[in-house]
Amino acid sequence: MLKLLLLRHAKSSWNDMDLSDHQRPLNNRGLKAAPKVGAYITNNGFTPELVLSSTATRARQTTQLVSEQFPEPVETHFLDELYNFSGFHTPLNIIRDQADQQSPLMVVGHNPTMEILAAELTGAGNSAARAMMHEKYPTAALAIIDFDIPRWADLQTGIGTLVQFIRPRDL
């Protein structure tokens, strides 16, 4: 059984219009939400073996603040491919390329990628969580998905079970 955590970056700031989209940092709300999500991950036994994150500043900050809540450092890779949206197939293939022992695997990215990926991968699971996820995938929201497969290379759409969908306001 493999476990995937799909985390949308925390709330970002639009205050400095001179910054490119890639450079936008977290705002105060995002700075408060990310550690709460990290604590939730740790306290519920979902600490990842590997984190893959977008290279955008807001995703990097989210990754750092979440990871600071883990009991020990976790291997982390920052990938440009998780910033540039080119359909859900790009992140899906990135996940498929990971070593099988790297579970839980956490991906930190952006919408619409995280929302589409979570929706496409899940075919079953907690009905209330699925409804909440399909309604809106807010910033710093986390989908926890189980797959009854032995290898990430076997990952297909619709085979995941949504275990939980967590929003920062619920923590």
PLM feature spans:
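Glycine-rich phosphate-binding loop signature in dinucleotide/nucleotide-binding domains
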Residues: 44-46, 97-103
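Conserved histidine-centered catalytic loops in small-molecule metabolism enzymes
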Residues: 49-69, 148-171
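A glycine-rich beta-strand to alpha-helix segment
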Residues: 103-119
